Amino acid sequence: MLNALYPLLRPALFSMDAEDAHHFTLNNLMRAKRMGLAGCIGNSIADDPRTVMGVRFPNPVGLAAGLDKDGAYIDGLAAFGFGFIEVGTVTPRAQPGNPRPRMFRLPQADALINRMGFNNGGVDAFIRNVQASRWKAEGGVLGLNIGKNADTPIERAADDYLYCLERVYPHASYVTVNISSPNTKNLRQLQGASELDSLLSTLKAAQQRLADQHKRYVPVALKIAPDLDDDQVRNIGDALVRHKIDGVIATNTTISRDAVKGLPHAEEAGGLSGRPVFEASTRVVRALREVIGDALPIIGVGGIFSGADARAKIDAGAQLVQVYSGLIYRGPTLVRECASALRR
């Protein structure tokens, strides 16, 4: 039902502040779920399983991190038919993020700009929400995305990632290490060669220790930016292979404004997502695949607004895809459309 209604609902949602609309929609999704109206919300899960990173994904279309930062809406979002859901980014301690307003629509470009700043309730509250959801207990694939607190010096970033990794590990299907948000000061420095080498070495050792402790291996993926030149992509790819990281998510939002110059809100600080990031993110997927070969899988994300867009990510070298901004603009029908386009 929501597939048909969303085009009618969208003007009302888009008349609201973007962040207010976000929370309004998610709260009502959960309300519908609790009332037993899940069948009216969206789609059944398309059965098109893929095994990636050693995990069986019911289908290759997932939700990107950022929509549900605290893991509070997992069961409502599950009704959209995703093959996997990624929640977060979560940090060790609760933090408010950046001052509002901090999310802006650019409807002329099917785009969003956000400078949320990892607003979240902290990893302990995050885990309680994850444990309360039925999605994982019922076999759903759940990615948990971790970051660092804004007031943690970049030199101590590894401490925050380790803290979060140790706490989310028992509850995750996979863990994503987010070093590519443009909204936490200096975070993208961790994509530099020496910084990345040190971080990945530390995290890989912790992953192996946690696997022994919990008698279960949970894969770790790295989320990278689209604003990378060929040398940077090569350095990152080499580091991923060298440290035997399980996967890579390409990409996060862009700081470029080339595709939206002159549009209202185009000069707002933050990360740009939506259609304008599609080409840049797909270029990184393709370049990364050339560097890493078949050593590890890529999850392609950035500007997917159609089944053809999802197929283009796969053709560029991704094994799975994720959506976010396209879901805001197109509604849950996008999930079914992408799953159909990728069906084998």
UniProtKB/Swiss-Prot annotation:
- Pfam families in the cross-refs: DHO_dh
Q: Which cofactor does it need?
A: FMN
Q: Where in the cell is it found?
A: Cell membrane
Q: Which cysteines are joined by disulfide bonds?
A: none
The EC number on file is: 1.3.5.2
Pathways involved: Pyrimidine metabolism; UMP biosynthesis via de novo pathway; orotate from (S)-dihydroorotate (quinone route): step 1/1
Q: Which SUPFAM superfamilies match?
A: FMN-linked oxidoreductases
Which residues hold FMN? Answer: 65-69, 89, 145, 178, 223, 251, 274, 303, 324-325
**Which Gene Ontology CC terms are recorded?**
cytoplasm; plasma membrane
Any one biological process term the GO annotation gives: 'de novo' pyrimidine nucleobase biosynthetic process
Report the co-factor binding details. Binds 1 FMN per subunit.
Cite the active-site annotation.
Answer: 181
* CDD domains hit by this protein: DHOD_2_like
For this UniProt record, give its keywords in alphabetical order, as a comma-separated list. Answer: Cell membrane, Flavoprotein, FMN, Membrane, Oxidoreductase, Pyrimidine biosynthesis
Q: Which reaction does it catalyse?
A: (S)-dihydroorotate + a quinone = orotate + a quinol
| Topology of this chain in the membrane | Peripheral membrane protein
Provide the binding site for substrate: 69, 114-118, 178, 183, 252-253
Q: Which GO terms describe its molecular function?
A: dihydroorotate dehydrogenase (quinone) activity
Described function: Catalyzes the conversion of dihydroorotate to orotate with quinone as electron acceptor.
Which family is this protein grouped under?
Belongs to the dihydroorotate dehydrogenase family. Type 2 subfamily.
Subunit structure and binding partners: Monomer.
| The name this protein goes by in its record | Dihydroorotate dehydrogenase (quinone)
Give the species this sequence originates from: Cupriavidus metallidurans (strain ATCC 43123 / DSM 2839 / NBRC 102507 / CH34)
Q: Identify the gene encoding this protein.
A: pyrD
